[in-house]
Amino acid sequence: MKSQRNGLAVDRREFLATTGGGLLAAAIPAAASVAVAAGGGAAPSPGTSGRAQTASTALRKIPIGVFDPVYDDLSLDEMLDKVSALGLEAMEIGTGGYPNSGHCPVDELLQDAGKAKAWKKKFEDRGIQVATLSCHGNPVHPDAKHAAKDAETFRKTVLLAERLDVKVIVGFSGCPGGSPSETQPNWITYRWPPEYAEMQDWQWKEKVIPYWKEAAKFARVHGIRRLAFEMHPKFVVYNPRTLMKLREAVGEEIGANCDLSHLFWQGCDPVEVIHFLGKQGAIFHAHMKDTVSFPENVAKYGVLNFAFDTGDLPQASETFRAVGYGHSASLWKSVVKAYMDTGYEGILSIENEDPILTGAVGVERAAYVLKNVRNELLGT
């Protein structure tokens, strides 16, 4: 059953999820105040008592930006005009792999320094920072051609980042097969029966760590010391523990793209995660994307039951939503505060994969929530 609000079809489950009893921002028109969406207060999430501090002008005004695939239907200039009109201050730009490179002609910019300068100037003329380049792929894929293609995309992205003076590259850790003979990735999260432990150990020792040691060395030579891995299911780095495992094995060039949408359903406390990683200087980038949980389906099917399409929602345990449509604005205020408290130096990059809201609307709604909670924290 769907209802109409603000001209949009909204699935009934949009109203079901709560955070500490607070209403979702989804249940409030976009023009309503964040204070109302937050249920009248900005209480920290569970497990964060004692961390609350009064807003201070010393807190950094973290730039709010957007990841460009949501605007794949627009030209570069059209996209930049749209982003500027929204008052966003930064962008994450795809350079290949899963995000593609629709707004960034990588080879052309590498071949011609003048074209690279002109490309970047389009952003600068609108007051938009090119904050990160993103090449999400699988450079340790068991298919050699697939792995080589994604590894080459990473290499070119490093060279382009050097040319553009961009300091952060975002991507995935990748996932190998479970043995030399496998032809597809094998995501192993449970070390039993014993052969799974053997396969997982082989993946890390023979594929993941050797590749990223060499890749980090290459990046370091070209002045890039921040490789931000999205902790994403189906890749070997999928939570804070596996991220730190790779960082400890490879070096401090490895850090997080902290996309909480992949951690909510795993049961992580978002503020706890930010403090845990942030205190170690291990957060290099942050995706702003929400997840809504449908308790009646979690009770029946468990959490490994994610939906990406609207047709799957009636049986889904979770799906992605725009910021504020899965958790209350007060929770997101605690999240932004945690980034400020831990000295995070990156941007808040809106990524829209909401199956209900269109891309443009999802970005606008997320930007509205994030701007308001940031302003409340800064007292502006």
Regions found by a protein language model. Give the residues of each.
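N-terminal secretory signal peptides
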Residues: M1-D11, V36
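C-terminal segment of N-terminal export signals and the immediately downstream linker at the start
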Residues: A30-G65, P69-D72, D81-K82
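Conserved, mostly hydrophobic/aromatic
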Residues: V66, V83, M91, F123, ...
